[in-house]
Amino acid sequence: MILIGMYDSPFVRRVGIALRLYGIAYEHRAWSVFGDAMKIMAYNPLVRVPTLVLDDGEALIDSAAILDALDEMVGPERAMTPRSGATRRAALKTCALAAGIADKAVSLVYERHVHERANPAWIERCAGQITRVMNQLEIARAAQTTRFWHGDTIGHGDVMVSCAVTFMRDALAGDMDLSPWQALKRHTDMCEDLPEFRETYMTFKIG
């Protein structure tokens, strides 16, 4: 397998962490959507990362779809998403909320540092969305008594939350105060201390 994309993307990183947690060997091609667009285009016409190329040449796109495929590959006993019912729905919601704030954080970075003129209304909108979701995730995590979000084994929600919060720490340093969300901080610190997280950490840089 080939994982395309740089680990400073929370979406590429969540896939890299899942592959490591599953013990699936892969080649990592740290291509940038800016500097390596033509290379990525050969596998993904959207020129987006992550892209995961399977051994038979099939290219999977979108991190959620990639994780769904990986869950299927390893089987229901090892899958990092619960099989069914309310627990599954809750886990998928955690993933969706965390992916949403990561997406909004990326939008903020582009608005502040890539666009020639920042749009204050758009910045306010994105920051408000992030704050509301972080508040909801904080309440949910603080209510959990288990080591991980939905039990004693790590799930995709744990990974996505940690990747999103770490990205915001790095990319939005000075722009957002993360101190109100102490349960999320503890969760992220715990996850980031795991080898699979350390091995995929990349300091975020513009350009």
Description of each model-found segment:
Residues 178-207:
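Long hydrophobic alpha-helical segments typical of transmembrane helices together
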